[in-house]
Amino acid sequence: MELNAYIDHTLLRPSASEAEVLRLCQEAQHYRFASVCVNPCHVALAAGAVRGTAVRVCSVIGFPFGTHVTEVKCAEAQRALDDGAQELDMVVRIDKVCAGEREVVEREIAQVAARCHARGAIVKVIVETALLDEMHIAFACSCVEAGHADFIKTSTGYASRGGTEGDIQCFKKYLKGETKIKASGGIRTRAQAQRFIELGCARIGTSNGVAIMEERAS
């Protein structure tokens, strides 16, 4: 698979305009990226812009801190799906991961995943690895699998750092099933993206997709 097919072309700035979202969608179609990842308020716009193409629409749930209660995350997910989202990146309750509260974490993931799967959509669970040690990452991997999420994702882009090679290796150490991995946060070059793919990532989240593709052209 070519590099472009791994990229979730991302625009999650709170100041992002509708014109910028439409440009994001045009770029995604031109470079044949896997998806556009936009804020919930822009899902319907993006869905209309990429309708009839292979580009999927991704949005975020409980973003960026994961501190929404489960009922709110479920409502967000339902609205995004109704607006045309095909993929949802949900921030887990990081405080509950750190506290080891398995039932709470698994139940929340399972509830959002069930809504997604009922509509033929996929869910990626953001665990914010910058805030976790290896023990917490192992716990998060177990919860993501138990909740039947499709992906585990490293980062929101709002913590002190994005995903690292060590994070990916840690995911691979503790994931036991078919859960896929998405790397994100600070991926700005072609070499970085390719390295994460070599490590086993199935998706790359980046707002620098065009620059990464143009790097090849130059």
From Swiss-Prot:
It holds the Pfam family DeoC. Signal peptide: none annotated. Its main location: cytoplasm. It is an enzyme of class 4 (lyase). Its EC number is 4.1.2.4. Belongs to the DeoC/FbaB aldolase family. DeoC type 1 subfamily. This is Deoxyribose-phosphate aldolase. SMART domains: DeoC. It is found in: Cytoplasm. The active site is at D89 (proton donor/acceptor), K153 (schiff-base intermediate with acetaldehyde), K182 (proton donor/acceptor). GO terms for biological process: 2-deoxyribose 1-phosphate catabolic process; carbohydrate catabolic process; deoxyribonucleotide catabolic process. One of its GO terms (cellular component) is cytoplasm. It comes from the Bacteria. It catalyses: 2-deoxy-D-ribose 5-phosphate = D-glyceraldehyde 3-phosphate + acetaldehyde. Keywords: Cytoplasm, Lyase, Schiff base. Pathway: Carbohydrate degradation; 2-deoxy-D-ribose 1-phosphate degradation; D-glyceraldehyde 3-phosphate and acetaldehyde from 2-deoxy-alpha-D-ribose 1-phosphate: step 2/2. One of its GO terms (molecular function) is deoxyribose-phosphate aldolase activity. Catalyzes a reversible aldol reaction between acetaldehyde and D-glyceraldehyde 3-phosphate to generate 2-deoxy-D-ribose 5-phosphate. InterPro entries: Aldolase_TIM, DeoC, DeoC/FbaB/LacD_aldolase, DeoC_typeI.
